[in-house]
């Protein structure tokens, strides 16, 4: 399973990129709005900051309701950073989103269909040609449903029908989500920087480092 970072914060993206574990970036209108920057400018900055990732998801804005409006926005977004091949168009899981997905896929544009909450939605998106689908774990957990089970069902379905669409586990809130979706068959987990930090931490690791440092301080030095 690969790691994307789910943020529009440039500093967090740069920190994650330096770790050598980052395969992509996902953004959405809410994340960009929180940064208080122009959407297109931030996507360009992200592309420049992480040139070796496979995907930077740029989502069409909520005022694009029809397939035609989504496609028009997508055509502008893929021009960002000189037509950067890493820009992936993120589309909502609606009928219009599916129509736009099919059109963009036929043009060779990578797509990420987001706000997936059922297996049937994932199957429709895959059949429309989506490069990625993004099932949301945390939001399902909030209504007492099992987001990890959804990922497992989608993974099984894609395997049975030999679908190439990749699963991005989204709305990931803690390390246990990451462990469980990796075991469930997600290709990618897109996570906030704070979860990346949590994945790297364990109190016994800290204690071990402190013990090594204390013992080394006592060792004879040449």
Swiss-Prot record:
EC number(s) stated in the UniProt entry for this protein: 2.2.1.2
Record's keyword terms, sorted: Cytoplasm, Pentose shunt, Schiff base, Transferase
Underlying gene: tal2
Task: Give the enzyme class.
Answer: transferase
**Gene3D superfamilies assigned to the protein according to its UniProt record, in alphabetical order:** Aldolase class I
- Highest lineage ranks of the organism? Bacteria, Bacillati, Bacillota, Bacilli, Bacillales
One GO term describing the cellular component: cytoplasm
- Relate the protein's function as given in its record: Transaldolase is important for the balance of metabolites in the pentose-phosphate pathway.
Q: PANTHER family under this entry?
A: TRANSALDOLASE
Q: Which organism is it from?
A: Bacillus cereus (strain ATCC 14579 / DSM 31 / CCUG 7414 / JCM 2152 / NBRC 15305 / NCIMB 9373 / NCTC 2599 / NRRL B-3711)
Q: Does the keyword DNA damage apply?
A: no
Active site residues per record: 90 (schiff-base intermediate with substrate)
- Which family does the record claim for this protein? Belongs to the transaldolase family. Type 3B subfamily.
> What is its subcellular localisation?
Cytoplasm
Q: One Pfam family for this entry, by name? A: TAL_FSA
Q: What is this protein called?
A: Probable transaldolase 2
């Amino acid at each position: 399973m690969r790691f994307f970072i789910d943020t529009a914060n440039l500093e967090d993206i740069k920190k994650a990129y330096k770790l050598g574990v980052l395969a992509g970036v996902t953004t959405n209108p809410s994340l960009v709005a929180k940064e208080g920057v122009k959407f297109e400018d931030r996507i360009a900055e992200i592309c420049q900051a992480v040139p070796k990732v496979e995907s930077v998801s740029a989502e069409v804005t909520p005022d694009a309701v029809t397939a035609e409006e989504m496609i028009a926005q997508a055509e502008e977004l893929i021009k960002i950073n000189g037509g950067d091949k890493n820009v992936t168009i993120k589309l909502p899981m609606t009928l219009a989103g599916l129509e736009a997905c099919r059109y963009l896929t036929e043009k060779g544009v990578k797509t990420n269909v987001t706000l997936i909450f059922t297996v049937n939605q994932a199957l429709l998106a895959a059949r429309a040609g989506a490069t990625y689908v993004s099932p949301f774990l945390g939001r399902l957990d909030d209504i007492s449903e099992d987001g990890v089970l959804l990922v497992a069902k989608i993974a099984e379905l894609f395997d049975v029908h030999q679908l190439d669409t990749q699963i991005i586990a989204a709305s990931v809130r803690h390390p246990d989500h990451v462990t469980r979706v990796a075991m469930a068959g997600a290709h990618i987990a897109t996570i906030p920087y704070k979860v990346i930090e949590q994945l790297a931490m364990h109190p016994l690791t800290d204690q071990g480092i402190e013990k090594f440092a204390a013992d080394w301080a006592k060792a004879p030095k040449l």
